[in-house]
Structure formats: structure tokens, C-alpha cells
Amino acid sequence: MTWNTRSVEERRKHIGSFVAVTPTMKRATDVFRRCYREYHEGQQASCSFVVGETGVGKTTAANDFMEEIREEYRGTLKDGIDVHTIDPKTYPTNMSVTFQQPGRGLVRPILKIMVSKKTTYKQLFGETLAALGMPTKRATLAEMKSIVRHQIEGQGVRMIIFDECQHIVDSSQIRDPYEAADFLKELMKETRVQICCVGLHYATDFLLENGQLETMKSEEHHMRPFPLDFNESAELCMFLRSLSDDLPFDRKPQLFTPALALRLHLASDGYVGYITKYVSMAAKDAIDQNLDTVTMDLIGDAYARKHNVPDKENPFRVKGEIDEDGFQKIKAARRKMLEEEACKSRATRRRKDREKSLRKAAAAA
């Protein structure tokens, strides 16, 4: 069946399912896999870190690894009893690998927990309990720890992925910013569960004050954006070729040609998340307009909508050769202007809030 005979809804949905297995993605997935395989191999658990800027594919790698483990469990036996898949609406597949074991309850080999902003030491235990399906607000910290130990063992949890771990370092609610290291250390020592922390580069900062947790760390992997390289074996071109082949069009776009690859790299700074976003938006436009493929003009439209910039600041609108350094300077100038405007706006809002508070205080006096 060709793509042009399929429904618009099916084609648009397919766009969101793309995962490219690039060397960068494979290295990250390997870190998750090694961490998972080390479960109960030693006297104590270990932890690993996968860090990088937003858009390099950290969460995508984690989700891809979870899908791999889900396939391993599907149709297998545990203690002689079949395990069955769970409705993803009840237990989202991007937050856990969860199965139902008839007569025994849930089996969750992997959990993924999104660390909230302004988290606290106690809240980290609370978030873990909620992920285990045991939310509790009234329990003491000691009770929480006991329930966590019991549920991790009972549900067969082998590994927990903590995403957005930089929030632990950022949080002003933790008295000692490295208190979180003790949380992870306790979790690994008392339950022997494997831990993988995902976040921005500085998510590893809380290791600095905790030598024991540093000893328990197995790996620290930094994901980085694609470098600008037009060689066919380079990651950028490999990724763009894979993305081109996957798009739901019978006439595949040539995203990997030097002219378009350069513009995609300039627009995204090499971050896979941004490249995918621009191309996905353009692909959906092409489907809605009944066009036979994705064009540079469509990607330019997507870039303009996303960033609200004039044509001279849109790399897909520049005809002929494009000045790489010149365009980077234009982007930097635009960002500086936006940051200055945001700073002025925040200052104005704060001044108005102070004036409002003073008026209220004066009226109450």
C-alpha cells in the first residue's frame, strides 16, 4: 500500500512515531541497557547518568530503551505464569514498563519518574511512591521509605529512571542541595534497585559533595548535538537520510542534500529535537495541502511560524549560498534582544507587584 492511499490521520500519526538509531542515540541506549543488566549482579546497586542540553534526544533514548524491555517481557513467563500487557491509558508506556501477572498483581521492571521543580527530599520519596501506584500524602518519611522498599520488591522493579534531574540541583526547597544524593544512595542501598539519572549537564553536580554516591556511579554519558558534517557517514546526514526515508510520502524528501542539511543545522544548532520539530510541522502541512513531499519552502513556513521572524532571519528563505557565520550572528542578536525584552518585562511586573503591595499596606494602615 502506498502512502497516498492512506488516510490523513494515519499519515499524521506516523510522523510522531519516528526514532532514528544514530550512533549518539545508540550510545545513550547502551548506557540504559548496561545499567539495567547490572541489576543484582553485585552486592550493591549502581547508578548511571545520561545528560545533555534540551533537544539532544535523552528522553527519546530512555523511551526507546523502555520499549525494548517491554518487548522482552511480552509473552514471557514469570514464575510459570504468563504476564499480560496493561492498557497504556492506565499506565502510560513512556512512564513505566508495566505488566499484569494473573493472581500476583503488577510487574514493573522499569519506572520513569519526572522530577518536579522545587522538589524536596521527602517529595522525592513521594514521587517514587506515586510512580509505584501508591500515592500518599499523610505518611511520615519513615513510613514512605518502608512502603517504597516493600513495593519495589513486590512489583519486581529492577531500574528507576529519574528524568529532569537538574531540578534536584536547582531546588531551593532542599536545605542542602546535595541532600538528593542521599536519597538516591538510600534507594540503591536499601532496595538494590538500579538508578539512571537523566537531565541537563549540571545534573551531576550533586555528586560533588557525596563521595559514596560517586563510588556507586558506573557511567556518566554526555549527549551532544550533531556537528556540521556533510559526509554520508556523518551522524547528521545519517539522521537526515533516515528521517527522509521514514516520512509518509511516496516521493521522499532529500533532507540530506548539502543545501538543506546546512539550513537545518543552522536552524537547529544540530539539536535533533529541533530538526524533527521543523520537519514534522512541514510534513503535516504537506499532507494537509495534498502535496507529494516536503519542500524547503514548507520547512521555511514552519520555521517562521515557530520563531516569528522575518525572511532575512529565516535560513530556509535565503536564496543561493548562505553565510554561516553571518546567520549565527543574526540568531545571537535576536536571542539577545528577546532576553533583554524579557528582563525588562519581568522588572516591570515586579515593580507593579511592589506598588500594589504598598497600596494595600497603606490602605490597611
What are these regions (language model features)?
Residues 159, 167-173, 178-259:
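The catalytic "switch" region of P-loop NTPases
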